[in-house]
């Protein structure tokens, strides 16, 4: 099934460029379109701010964390599906993210097939 590149674009928000590249390669190999952002602030200034089909977000980033980004989007009524990935997650963080509406919360290293399944589910594919 061909993707509409504008309505099915996945935003990757992570301050680690190697992780951005790895996630983008994984998604593109699965036939999905992705665009990378090095910070929550960069994403908020972009044209995908409230229009991305799904977000893959690192929890811990300089300045604005993934959880703060999630709260900001909620304030602005941007109801985007968010999948969190983190190397520093704990139960409290996971509960907070899920209560705020996260689709998934994956600890690094994570299962690539599980991530793809969650992304496809968020995209209703």
Task: Give the predicted meaning of each segment.
Residues 76, 88-89, 100:
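Short, conserved "switch-loop" micro-motifs in signal-transduction and mechanochemical regulators
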Residues 108:
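A Lys-centered signature of the CheY-like receiver
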Residues 50-57:
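Active-site beta3 strand of CheY-like receiver
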Residues 1-11, 17-19, 24, 45, ...:
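Non-catalytic signal-transmission and effector/linker regions of two-component phosphorelay proteins
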Residues 61:
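Receiver (REC) domain active-site loop signature in two-component systems and cognate sites
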Residues 38-39, 65-69:
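Acidic catalytic/metal-coordinating carboxylates
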């Amino acid at each position: 099934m061909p993707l509409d590149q504008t309505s099915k674009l996945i935003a990757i928000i992570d301050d680690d460029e190697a992780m951005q590249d790895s996630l983008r390669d994984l998604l593109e190999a699965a036939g999905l379109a992705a665009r990378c952002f090095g910070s929550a602030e960069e994403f908020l200034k972009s044209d995908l701010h409230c229009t991305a089909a799904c977000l893959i977000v690192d929890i811990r980033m300089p300045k604005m964390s993934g959880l703060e980004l999630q709260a900001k989007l909620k304030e602005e009524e941007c109801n985007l599906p968010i999948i969190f990935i983190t190397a520093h997650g704990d139960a409290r963080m996971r509960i907070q993210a899920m209560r705020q509406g996260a689709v998934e919360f994956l600890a690094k290293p994570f299962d690539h097939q599980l991530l793809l399944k969650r992304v496809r589910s968020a995209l209703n594919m």
